[in-house]
UniProtKB/Swiss-Prot annotation:
Pfam families: Glyco_tran_28_C, MGDG_synth. CDD domains: GT28_Beta-DGS-like. This is Processive diacylglycerol beta-glucosyltransferase. GO terms for biological process: enterobacterial common antigen biosynthetic process; glycolipid biosynthetic process; lipoteichoic acid biosynthetic process. It comes from Bacillus mycoides (strain KBAB4). PANTHER family: MONOGALACTOSYLDIACYLGLYCEROL SYNTHASE (PTHR43025), MONOGALACTOSYLDIACYLGLYCEROL SYNTHASE 1, CHLOROPLASTIC (PTHR43025:SF3).
Length: 388
């Protein structure tokens, strides 16, 4: 029995989602009295130069490298086998081995598909339980390894796909994707309208433009939406200062139809009062939207997990997917004028949402590692041969 386990959470800075999930899990462990929690960007610490290059290429996939990323994501999915797994497992291996020897964690959690842990576990015979927390509404084979003890997934759909691949159903827990605790609180909307100087009598369109130029023609879009009667447009630019300054010129023309913000710490507050939102289909953003039942317009998904996320939400009736710039204004305006459709999308979001996913995950992990002395986590009896 582990009375006060040491927890190692491994993540990667490819987008903010994986790191955000890691931090949310860390906070949840601490809230439950587990103080010895380490969060490590394994690839960033092990291979900083390679990581910087691949992060740059990842961000470029949003704008000019879509076909390259499509080839990588779906190509690896098709040919993933023991040779590729063995090659990929070497990334971060040396740093990980040092971490395990020095820190001696009792539990390891991956919020990014890092198979160095289960590979080391298999090769040197360590008995640390390993948990994978999937951060999208789909699954790539790179997440799967027979030495992983349990998987936490967003939906029953993901679980079914994994079972079809060969993962035993008892190793998969449908919890939802961990989101910041602020998204699970109740707040009086009047406070939010006052804080951001918004008009409660107008519909609101929230545009999450991001910091990497992934949403095209934002200024032109805002100009078009500003002409729509009884609509207030709110743009969150993140850390994109150039975009913020560009849009501030529009805002300063005197119209109250546009509000421009940079980085918003408590962005859940804007989610709570918007009629719908234009954004990219990242797994965490979609989970946050589901928590607050925000209808989403998903802008030009990148091939790979973004596209798979978008297809899932579109099929569920929770999202409108935009695949061409020419569709953005017309489809968004039509949705804003269709109250019945907005209500249906809210209900669809409600059906997708799983309450308190971080708490569910942490409680499950702690229960398994406190359950009995010498507890042995469930093992995969057999997995597809390609998963090593």
């Amino acid at each position: 029995m582990i009375k006060n386990p040491k927890v190692l959470i491994l993540t990667a800075h490819y987008g903010n989602g994986h790191v955000q999930v890691a931090k949310t899990l860390e906070q949840t462990f601490r809230q439950k009295g587990i103080e010895d929690v380490i969060v490590c960007d394994l690839f960033g610490e092990s291979h900083p130069v390679i990581t910087d290059i691949t992060k740059y290429l990842y961000l470029k996939s949003y704008t000019v490298g879509k076909e390259l990323y499509r080839l990588f994501y779906y190509g690896v999915e098709k040919i993933y086998d023991k040779k590729i797994a063995s090659w990929y497992a070497n990334f971060g291996r040396k740093r990980l081995k040092t971490l395990l020897q020095v820190e001696k964690p009792d539990i390891v959690i991956n919020t990014f598909p890092i198979i160095a842990v289960p590979e080391l576990k298999k090769q040197i015979g360590i008995s640390i339980p390993v948990y994978n927390v999937l951060t999208d509404f789909c699954v790539h084979k790179i997440w799967i390894h027979r030495e992983v003890d349990r998987y936490f997934v967003a939906t029953d759909h993901v679980k079914k796909v994994m079972v079809d691949i060969g993962v035993p159903a008892e190793q998969i827990v449908e919890t939802g994707i961990p989101i910041r605790s602020s998204f699970e609180l109740k707040i009086n909307p009047a406070i939010i309208y006052n804080k951001y100087q918004l008009c409660k009598d107008k519909k609101m369109l929230l545009i999450v433009a991001g910091a990497h130029g992934v949403l095209g023609s934002v200024k032109e879009l805002c100009q078009s939406f500003m002409s729509v009667p009884n609509l207030q447009v709110v743009v969150v630019c993140g850390k994109n200062e150039a975009l913020k300054q560009d849009l501030m010129e529009l805002q300063e023309q005197g119209s109250d139809a546009l509000k421009v913000f940079g980085y918003v710490e408590n962005i859940d507050e804007l989610f709570r009062v918007t009629s719908c939102m234009i954004t990219k289909p990242g797994g965490i953003t979609l989970s946050e939207a589901a928590a607050l039942q925000v209808p989403v317009i998903l802008y030009k998904p990148v091939p790979g997990q973004e596209n798979e996320n978008a297809l899932y939400f579109e099929k569920k009736g929770a999202a409108v997917v935009i695949r061409d710039d020419s569709e953005v204004f017309a489809k968004t305006e039509a949705l804003l004028q269709d109250d019945m459709k907005l209500l249906q999308m809210k209900e669809a979001m409600k059906s997708i949402y799983r309450p308190e996913p971080a708490g569910h995950i942490v409680d499950t992990i702690l229960a398994e590692n406190h359950a009995e002395p010498n507890h042995i986590p469930i093992k995969s009896p057999v997995l597809a041969e390609s998963f090593t």
